[in-house]
């Protein structure tokens, strides 16, 4: 899920190689690292009866980052508690102007009784800023412990194969935003592909207009419940071309 924040100019230092830092644990704590802002983003923590989460940078350089997040959450089993994520900093770009969005993502998850997703979260709107988002596009590399996406019916609307992976596609509303969720049929811990292929599919098959702007591109995890959990991202990269 996206939380709007004031954008900040990246300093020259942020483009340099960055090594491991201390973890941050506050609800809205962030760290700028390379081309990314890393968010702890405990937006749903009030849905938990107890729990906490901390996130940290392991290394970063340009459009590549390694990072981790550790958490334990109890209660509110049907509610997402957070979305720790690495958000690419870029100017909103019209889909028709994008030729490719190459991305790699290698990760592992450990812990007990984990219910969570590991997912890209992207937004499309009629303007280049994030004030007019109409669509949320999620690409779930994993649905752990029975986690499920937003869906009007609970049923898939298609099962496309994109970037060599077969996905269950769901759709449903989140307020005024239409959500499309591509959920990998098998957990994919080592992903390499072109995220633009998902937008091309939606333009060709679901009536999404290529005049819309990509305004947000994030990658992280949405936990529901679990204990002593850690998502470790050993390699993540993305760029818009």
From Swiss-Prot:
GO terms for cellular component: extracellular region. InterPro entries: ConA-like_dom_sf, GH11/12, GH12. It comes from Aspergillus niger (strain ATCC MYA-4892 / CBS 513.88 / FGSC A1513). One of its GO terms (molecular function) is cellulase activity. Keywords: Carbohydrate metabolism, Cell wall biogenesis/degradation, Glycoprotein, Glycosidase, Hydrolase, Polysaccharide degradation, Secreted, Signal. This is Probable xyloglucan-specific endo-beta-1,4-glucanase A. Belongs to the glycosyl hydrolase 12 (cellulase H) family. Glycans are attached at residue 47. Its main location: secreted. SUPFAM superfamilies: Concanavalin A-like lectins/glucanases.
